Amino acid sequence: MLQDSASPHSNDEKRAALADAAWALLAAHDIDKIGLDTVADMAGIEHGLAGALGGSVQRLVLAKMATLDSQSVMESFDDIKDAGEVSIREKIIEGLLHRFETYAPYRAQIDQLNRSARRHPELALRLLDGLEAVVRRVLVMAGDSAHGLKGMLRVKGVVAVFLATARVWMKDESPDLAATMKMLDQRMVKAEEWGFSLRLFDGKHGDHADQNHHDDSSASRYGVDND
């Protein structure tokens, strides 16, 4: 049982305990083979109440991911708000990289979800929807309104960057995620080039100058379209 020292009291605490238990079990089990009663037993919650609070193991797993995503975004916000003059591009990279850092202890769970998503399209859609939601939060936090059709396309572009980088992240055992950072930076450059070719940014991006590791021609690639 997860709750051996202090049992949860409120329904919110019990739901969180169920989500934690489902997430822990996911590290070693296919999501299809995890029973809600098993999750309830691990969390120390009565079976009927677990059904009322959680509904399904999948819902509990997604709830745990939503909690981790909120934690990641708010920690990135705390880092960024005191960072001074930082480009939108670097803020976005910081937000994405921190999500990878947040999930680094949970690669086993992500691997299980990736396998399950190939068999269950509805799970794949839910995971993608959750990723789009957190990417939108990162963009808005960084100063990109992500508004309108162009904003939606920018969100989807950054989602594609994240998914491509995730393949490297799954194998990146370095403490500073150096390989992940390198791939993320490279993919962002390519995404920005596509964004400009498709006119997804306005021309006013001089305030978002790129950093020293890019040449002058590639500086300030990430503009903001306030449409």
Stretch-by-stretch model annotation:
Residues 11, 15-23:
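Short, leucine-enriched amphipathic alpha-helices that occur as contiguous helical runs
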Residues 1-13, 201-227:
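N-terminal intrinsically disordered/low-complexity leader segments
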Residues 81, 85, 140-147:
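Acidic/His metal-coordination segments adjacent to aromatic residues that form catalytic metal sites
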Residues 121-144, 152-164:
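Amphipathic alpha-helical packing segments from all-alpha helical-bundle domains
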Residues 144-206:
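Hydrophobic/aromatic-rich alpha-helical bundle segments in the mid-to-C-terminal region
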Residues 2, 17, 25-67:
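Helix-turn-helix
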Residues 59, 63, 77-112, 119, ...:
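Hydrophobic alpha-helical connector segments
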Residues 65-73, 121:
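Short, basic, alpha-helical segments at the C-terminal edge of helix-turn-helix-like DNA-binding modules
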